[in-house]
Amino acid sequence: MKKIFLLISVILFIFPVQAQYTLRLMTYNIKNANGMDDICSFQRVANVINNASPDVVAIQEVDSMTCRSGQKYVLGEIAERTQMHAYFAPAIEFDGGKYGIGLLTKQVPLRLQAIPLPGREEARTLILAEFEDYIYCCTHLSLTEEDRMKSLEIVKSLIASYKKPLFLAGDMNAEPESDFIKELQKDFQILSNLEKHTYPAPDPKETIDYIAASKQNATGFAVISARVVNEPMASDHRPILVELRTAEKADKIFRTK
């Protein structure tokens, strides 16, 4: 890991005409804002996000217009409380509405794409958001290893043509020592801290949530910090926050329009 950080630092160093800025990536399985105290609170989830101050958040387990959520657009409720843009990708029809994943972003994406993924217990999906300088993907993978492996092949095929730094975030339903994570690491560098558990939130004993970077374009950034946010109550998962230092051309950093 030290060698990787040193290499990335060198890559940043050899661009003296570029400025540097930070990018804060987050992933959070919010359990539809239902906390461990059985209280549904959009504001509590929003507070967790606001305190972390991310640029983009991968959200898992979120309803849209379901009866159990009072026919509310849950992601929109949280977006309103965080002053972020909301993008929802349904995975299944559920309880009079839809259930799936989403993104919260400070910056409006240039392009969005939702891709169905296999899941024998329930359908899964991936949402890809392309920004000017990077790509952020959110997913919530199947409980079944075979489905996760098939999903990974779909993801790898999808991202092969992209040249920008690309990040994959979400609830992978697999622990670091699993065959799936070992396979994932062939093509992705995991940026989040594998030694810090994310589930269950009150007393985490498993690491099943991740933020990773595609190795094919893993240049121009360095990890400043990677942590699991200490939030035991708002959901059954704890969120992950990764902060990156990235190299950017000065004319983009200091643009006035």
Residue spans for each PLM region:
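Sec-exported extracytoplasmic/periplasmic mature domains
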Residues: 50-54, 79-83, 87, 109, ...
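Active-site beta-strand/loop signature of hydrolases that rely on acidic residues for catalysis
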Residues: 23-30, 45-69, 136-139, 155-181, ...
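Metal-dependent phosphoester-hydrolase catalytic domains
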Residues: 114-115, 145-149, 157-167, 173-257
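Beta-strand-turn-beta hairpins that frame and shape the catalytic cleft
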Residues: 19-26, 106-110, 122-138, 244-250
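N-terminal, active-site-proximal structural segment of metallo-dependent hydrolase catalytic domains
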Residues: 17-81, 93-97, 153, 245-257
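Bacterial Sec-dependent N-terminal signal peptides
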Residues: 1-22
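Structured beta-strand-rich core segments of catalytic domains in phosphoester-bond hydrolases
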Residues: 37-38, 62-134, 220, 224-230
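Active-site-proximal beta-strand/loop segments in catalytic clefts of secreted hydrolases
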Residues: 28-31, 60-62, 89-92, 105-107, ...
